[in-house]
Amino acid sequence: MVHLIPFYKDANFKIKEAPEIIDFVKKKRYDYHKYLECLTETFYRYNPEGKLLLSTDMTTNPVNYQGECYRQDTSDKTIIQSKVYNETRLICDDNGIDENIIMCGTDHLINRKLDKIFLNQDFDIKIPIRKTARVNNAMIVVKKVTDNVKRFFEYRYERFISDEDSDPHWDWYGDQRTYDKILREELNLLPVREPPQKFPYQLGSYEVRGCKIKLIEYGGNECGSFDIWPNHRRGFEDNTYFYDFKGKRKEYFFSSYEKERRNYERQRKKEDIRVSP
């Protein structure tokens, strides 16, 4: 069974948040509750035997969300700090969830059955890499929680805390730049300056701190990035499992959801006609 575990918590701004959080929530007013609703619907559309578990704080209750929650008290933490903390505790504590895990945000849509991301593949953790040769953790995939996997995530949390003052944009990018730092150090891919510039990641499998880490393409079939060019006409590709709506792509989230929902319903009707007596 696939466990999709998106993180989301309401921003209260009693703690200083990243400028991007202020921009998305207060200025652009992106509707993360509605994103979650669409993500949930598309997940169960293709994965009826799977389970979606919202990772959040003790007080967030998204509108129209009736599923289960994994809650941690992160009232003293920013949203990115909370995300990293929840991901760490989810993997490292005994929560009864120990295999076929996809951790993500809410601004995503599912496009097909997700179990093939795990089947007949030898890895512990999958991490997406952008074409600019940096980590984008739109999704982090864990095949099975082992002791080494737990130690990897504990170390990642330690580095997230210890490196917090090394980057002025850590309050927004720190969750994924921590992965970058660990990978660069372990694979001896050290950039000349911080924050990390381009460096030669090669997709494939690597041994990192006792774990088999598989680097996959951000924008590829497993972790797709919705493409708004050319002329905003592109739809979903049938062989792409998961679509991320990064940055300005969020403006196309709901129209894409409606378009793909209609396509799905038309396809179902065609299939029903073919099998009808």
Residue ranges and their predicted role:
Residues 73-76, 80-135, 141-145, 149-150:
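GT-A fold catalytic core of metal-dependent nucleotide-sugar glycosyltransferases
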Residues 1-80, 93-98:
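N-terminal anchoring/stem segment of glycosyltransferases
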Residues 34-37, 82, 86, 173-181:
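A structural signal for well-ordered alpha-helical segments within the folded catalytic domains
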Residues 4, 53-55, 102-105, 110, ...:
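A structural signal for short, well-ordered beta-strand segments and their strand-loop junctions
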Residues 45, 90, 181-182:
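Residue-level signal for well-ordered alpha-helical scaffold segments within enzymatic catalytic domains
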